[in-house]
């Protein structure tokens, strides 16, 4: 369901100005969440396998099947065809690494635990060049369990106070293709030897396969040009990827670990949906772009199911007079440029909810 009138972005609140509770707060956050879960489960039960998993699996399969066309386009000297190859490879790369890894991390691609593990290793380690264990721990066990709780799931890993607003917003995203495998290798010190060796092998397989295909299929003549093309395709959507990760949580209410609200209040206050953007919805997935609130409330739902339950969730939250944060990419971009010091450099103020 498209928002008819986007809400203004929620501003951080000082602890001396506590937020007023919703009128339905006396019913308790747990009761509200159970009521919403029943409504969502009714939608899930009446949905086919195609709706629950098939649509997203088809998008990922299409991205894999489109890779040969992208590599072959790079053989052409025609600038338009070459640019098409870069675009195909870049969009497919982000579809596999962001959408695929995100769904695999949550076990939303299949109901089989064995296949969930296989897809997790493939998308996170082979495609993304990161560690499956740290992706699961950092994203699922910390960010989702403690959304916007300062020091736990507050998205602070995305803050780089040493950079000014223009360097961060425009230049820092280019570091992502290089920083991702380097961070992964650094974190291997904290895992068992067998796990570290497996991760190194899978990351190396993914990176070398990309490099080998550029040399042997795309026809690049020297290693430096192949590495440059790897960097170009892997950074194609790096800017919106970094921006989205900060737009949807930072600048919204933050909570202390000792006084965090109930789950439904935490997610409705601390999560924001962006307006639908076709390319980003395709490459990153609805659960990251336009259905992020729904995803945080029901993280095991696939992207397509998050989109399907969105009308139910948005109507329920509004009927119960709970926040349902929505904004456009451009509006958040302008807001972060204007208030970068407050959002990305200074310590976030703590929001206290009176009566919840």
Swiss-Prot record:
GO molecular function: oxidoreductase activity, acting on paired donors, with oxidation of a pair of donors resulting in the reduction of molecular oxygen to two molecules of water
InterPro entries, sorted: FA_desaturase_dom, Fatty_acid_desaturase
Chain location of the short sequence motif Histidine box-2 per the record: 139-143
Region (Disordered): 1-25
Lipid metabolism as UniProt keyword: yes
Region annotation 3 X 6 AA tandem repeat of M-E-P-T-E-P: where it falls in the sequence: 1-18
Sequence repeats: 1-6, 7-12, 13-18
The protein's annotated pathway: Lipid metabolism; fatty acid metabolism
Pfam families (alphabetical): FA_desaturase (PF00487)
One GO CC term on file: membrane
Subcellular location: Membrane
Presence of the UniProt keyword Repeat in the record: yes
Predominant location: membrane
Membrane protein topology class: Multi-pass membrane protein
Sequence motif Histidine box-1, residues: 102-106
GO biological process: fatty acid biosynthetic process; lipid metabolic process
Alphabetical keyword list: Fatty acid biosynthesis, Fatty acid metabolism, Lipid biosynthesis, Lipid metabolism, Membrane, Oxidoreductase, Repeat, Transmembrane, Transmembrane helix
Positions of short motif Histidine box-3: 292-296
Membrane-spanning residues: 54-74, 78-98, 118-138, 166-186, 200-220, 269-289
EC number: 1.14.19.-
Record-stated family: Belongs to the fatty acid desaturase type 1 family.
Protein name in UniProt: Fatty acid desaturase 6
Organism: Homo sapiens
Gene name, Swiss-Prot/TrEMBL: FADS6
């Amino acid at each position: 369901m498209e928002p008819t009138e986007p809400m203004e972005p929620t501003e951080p609140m000082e602890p001396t100005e506590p937020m007023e509770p919703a009128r339905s707060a006396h019913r308790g956050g747990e009761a509200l969440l159970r009521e919403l879960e029943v409504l969502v489960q009714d939608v899930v039960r009446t949905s086919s396998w195609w709706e629950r998993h098939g649509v997203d699996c088809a998008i990922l399969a299409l991205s894999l099947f489109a890779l040969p066309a992208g590599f072959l386009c790079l053989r052409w000297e025609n600038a338009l065809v070459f640019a098409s190859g870069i675009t195909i490879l870049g969009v497919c790369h982000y579809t596999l690494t962001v959408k695929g890894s995100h769904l695999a991390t949550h076990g939303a691609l299949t109901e089989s635990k064995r296949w969930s593990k296989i897809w997790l290793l493939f998308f996170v380690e082979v495609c993304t060049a990161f560690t499956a264990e740290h992706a699961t721990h950092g994203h699922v066990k910390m960010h989702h369990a403690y959304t916007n709780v300062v020091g736990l799931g507050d998205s602070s890993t995305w803050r780089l106070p040493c950079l000014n607003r223009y360097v961060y917003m425009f230049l820092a995203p280019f570091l992502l293709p290089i920083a991702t495998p380097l961070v992964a290798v650094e974190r291997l010190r904290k895992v068992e030897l067998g796990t570290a060796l497996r991760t190194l092998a899978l990351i190396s397989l993914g990176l070398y396969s990309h490099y080998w295909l550029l040399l042997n299929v795309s026809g690049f003549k020297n290693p430096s040009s192949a590495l440059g093309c790897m960097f170009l395709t892997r950074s194609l959507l790096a800017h919106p990827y970094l921006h989205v990760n900060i737009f949807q949580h930072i600048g919204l209410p933050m909570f202390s670990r000792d006084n965090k609200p109930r789950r439904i209040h935490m997610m409705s206050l601390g999560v924001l949906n962006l307006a639908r953007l076709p390319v980003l919805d395709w490459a990153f997935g609805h659960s990251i772009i336009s259905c992020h609130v729904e995803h945080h409330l029901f993280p095991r739902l696939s992207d397509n199911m998050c989109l399907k339950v969105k009308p139910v969730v948005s109507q329920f939250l509004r009927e119960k007079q709970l926040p349902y944060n929505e904004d456009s990419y451009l509006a958040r971009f302008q807001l972060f440029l204007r208030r970068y010091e407050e959002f990305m450099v200074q310590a976030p103020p703590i929001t206290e909810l009176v009566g919840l």
